[in-house]
Regions:
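Short intrinsically disordered terminal tails
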Residues: 1-2, 88-91
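Basic/aromatic-rich interaction segments and small domains that mediate binding to polyanionic partners
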Residues: 3-85
Length: 91
């Protein structure tokens, strides 16, 4: 993946399950602090082979991780998360 920078749109690997509404999905993805779960609109997701990706915007680039914002409603965060760079895919 090319060098990542602030405001780049990326995909973050996630697990997808049905949500409460037809256009919403429950997702879980790994962060540096452990997994987080929440609801996102179906339009924020794409499937590449067997892998699901949720759209995220890079807010900060650190040596070991990325700070990203994921649009949605999460149980333990406001959508900001620190993820390992290996979980990021070019959008």
């Amino acid at each position: 993946m090319p060098e990542m920078k602030v405001r780049d749109v990326i995909g973050v690997e996630c697990i997808v399950q049905p949500g409460p509404f037809s256009d919403e999905r429950l997702i879980t993805f790994d962060t540096t602090d452990g997994p987080i779960s929440g609801f996102v609109q179906e339009a924020e997701l794409r499937q590449v082979g067997k892998t699901w990706l949720v759209r995220a915007v890079i807010m900060a680039v650190r040596d070991d991780f990325l700070e990203v914002r994921v649009r949605g409603s999460f149980f333990t965060t406001n959508g900001l998360a620190n993820i390992q760079k290996r979980h990021a895919v070019a959008a």
